[in-house]
Amino acid sequence: MSALRRDLDDYLVIRRALGFKLERAGLLLADFVAHLEANETDPITTDAALAWATLPPNGASDWWAQRLAVVRSFARHLHAIDPTHEVPPPGLLPGRSHRATPYLYSDSDIAALMAAARGLRSPLRAATFETLVGLLAVTGLRIGEALRLDRDDVDLVDGVLVIRLSKFGKSREVPLHPSTVDALAAYTRERDRLCRRPVDRAFFVSTAGTRLLYCNAHLAWLDLVRRAGLQPRSVTCRPRPHDLRHSFAVRTLLGWYPDGADVHARMPLLSTYLGHVHPGNTYWYLSAAPELLTLVVARLDATVGAPA
């Protein structure tokens, strides 16, 4: 093992101990180190970093910028230990940050998705995806969090989900509405009736009795969207599973404003419920829907007075 590869292993261990998963970054950096080894380059140089970051030659500039950003973080770590490693300066490969426009689901959209799930040929598959869609809609869970749920993580007595080692390695408890508990209990009975010999302890199972894989769940989602007749609203606004999370947050905020609630004081509660590390990530939802912006402006006008 080369010194650079050992350095990479140490870097990933340290960063992951701090809560960063670095799944994609770990793969990219392993490829970067392999590139340096193949070209017998050590220490890291800006030229070598640029040469690797701009692969493939016909790649998108945004992708090149992301690749270089991953290298810069690793290079900063090494430079602090050994100053012979160069840190590529920022701005060498400027890329634009494209944040997808949230597809905010209406109640009828969610009902259409659940109806589409009920129409699936396999009774187990139908029950699984109808319940999964409903759970994402009423809790704002990340789809990966829902797929990783074990049976022991779903407490139907106290009405609580235990989300273990989610994004940034955080765990949390998510309280459930009684109607959600009833729906999960109904799925549990149906799942156990249709799948008498599950392969593992997953709460949501495939027709083979195994835990649902994200890639398969994503393909199933695309099928449900098609069956439900949901259409993209723009090139950057397509119905994605993660947008159920956006929709939950926006609906929660929309419910607070008419009640006259102190939204700023309640934001940390929503952040904790959603599993956000930084409240700023939750504040982003204020700009996610025109209805929210209208309510924010109205609240400001009522507080400081409308302009003359």
Please annotate each region the language model reported.
Residues M1-A308:
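Conserved catalytic core of the tyrosine transesterase superfamily
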